[in-house]
Curated annotation (Swiss-Prot):
Protein name as catalogued: Phosphoribosyl-AMP cyclohydrolase
Chain positions recorded as Mg(2+) binding sites: D92, D94, D96
Matching NCBIfam families: PRK00051.1 (NF000768)
Matching Pfam families: PRA-CH (PF01502)
Functional pathway: Amino-acid biosynthesis; L-histidine biosynthesis; L-histidine from 5-phospho-alpha-D-ribose 1-diphosphate: step 3/9
The keyword ATP-binding is assigned to this record: no
Cofactor(s) the record lists: Mg(2+); Zn(2+)
Broadest EC class assigned to this enzyme: hydrolase
Protein species of origin: Rhizobium meliloti (strain 1021)
Oligomer and partners: Homodimer.
């Protein structure tokens, strides 16, 4: 069974305080998903979901996302074994973003680079230019081995 979502109410108070989950997908049919570790709160990734991905996530308890670059649905961790079990989903005040608190199986890594989080670099300024510096270079798995042939 695939869940369907009602259109968001016109009444702002109903949208912000009513009991119905009525996600506000953007013009491309997507909603932003912020993903953190349910255990320690670390920010793991930011992704997008279409209605099908959100529905599958709610129905199965496993995180599904929509890849804009590949133009397809994907179950997070299906290739790597690092499945995300959803412990809680929250939505923001105007229901145009969701927050998933997850437990990560396998190597406890979320990023395709093998790192725990996709946010492994800091941004700063050096010599008048914006630069990035790697602050977490620990890889929980070797992407070349995990994704060979993909």
């Amino acid at each position: 069974m695939t869940l369907t979502f009602a259109s968001p109410p016109q009444d702002k108070a109903e949208l912000e305080s009513g009991p119905a989950f009525t996600p506000r997908f953007d013009e491309k049919g997507l909603i932003t998903a912020v993903v953190t570790d349910a255990r320690d709160g670390e920010l793991l990734m930011v992704a997008h979901m279409n209605a099908e991905a959100l529905s599958l996530t709610l129905e199965t308890g496993f995180a599904h996302y929509y890849s804009r670059s590949r133009d397809r649905l994907w179950k997070k961790g299906e290739s790597s074994g690092n499945l995300q079990t959803v412990r809680e989903i929250r939505t923001d005040c105007d229901q145009d973003a969701v927050w998933l608190k997850v437990s990560v199986a396998g190597h406890d890594a979320t990023c395709h680079t093998g790192r725990r989080s996709c946010f492994y670099r800091t941004v700063g300024v050096a010599d008048g230019e914006a630069k990035v510096a790697i602050t977490d270079d620990h890889r929980h798995f070797d992407p070349a081995q995990i994704y060979a042939g993909n």
